[in-house]
Amino acid sequence: MPLKATDDQFIAVWTRLKKPREVSQELGITLRATMDRRRAVEAKYGIHLPTKGSSNFKGWQSEKGKKLSKLAEQRARRYEVEINDTLKDGVVLIASDAHYWPGIVTVAHEAFCRLAKQLSPQMVILNGDVFDGARISRHARIMWEKQPLVKDEIGTVQDRCAEIERAAGKAKLIRTIGNHDARFENYLSGRVGEFEEMTGMTLLDYLPRWRAGWVVHLNKETESWLTIRHRPVSGGIHASYNSTLRAGVSYVHGHLHKLQVTPWADYRGRRYGVDTGTLAEPYGPQFNYCEAGPVNWASGFAVVTFVGGKMLQPELCVVEHGKAWFRGKEV
């Protein structure tokens, strides 16, 4: 094992050994560095790395370690209102509305994973509605349609997100809360509120590596300010245009499944409204409520590139004729 282990290597070693001293010996680092690294990894991914036995390291744990421990504990159990970050150079992959369904792996999802490997993004953002929640919707079941169990949906969401995690490498993993995602906690909080804060009562528990919140701001208060949020600022046929116009910054949203980029320019420069479409198939079983009517939707996702702190025009990967296309080539 190299002296400078990656996060994945550290997690694998800790999971196997579960003893700080043995982990430190295998990695060739001090015991204090091992514990500080553990807390840093827990805070970064919102996970808990358990310790075997009853060893107590509080006597020597650094102040930094204590702060990281507290941060990990908080992040593992809560959503953030705003997620703020900066990016000077690199790629951000943004997809939304996967509505992952048991037994279905879409062309768009496979393309998302392939481009995550090819482009080595700095960030991967799932912009809401990874979960569908068909059986726990406030809307009535349509006739006798077959709907998957919640546990099967959750398992599928975990499988698909794990595929993205493996493909994304060292990229930061972020997801925003969509209205379908909220169905999970809404259903539980309204019916079994006494179980609040117990393990398994939030989607955070099932996707621990993903930082989660309502909105993401990149390069806030700069000319390349980019906001990513599930819902558009304004709906309708001109939603992406109105969203960047009213937000005053480049604005990426999901929810409407259209997949389009709308530029807008004024005295402050050029900015963009982006609808990230859907990772699902537009006529998939998740959308039976459309009653087989035509939908102005498209399967695909967005790719945003920053160079020298400047945001370039967002690009789209679109599924057409059964294949995913990006920059004129099949993915």
Ranges and model annotations:
Residues E80, A95, Y100-L207:
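Core catalytic region of metal-dependent phosphoesterases/phosphodiesterases
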Residues T86-V91, Q118, E315-V331:
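Polar, enzyme-active/binding microenvironments
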Residues A43-Q74:
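Short Lys/Arg-enriched helix C-cap and helix-to-coil transition segments
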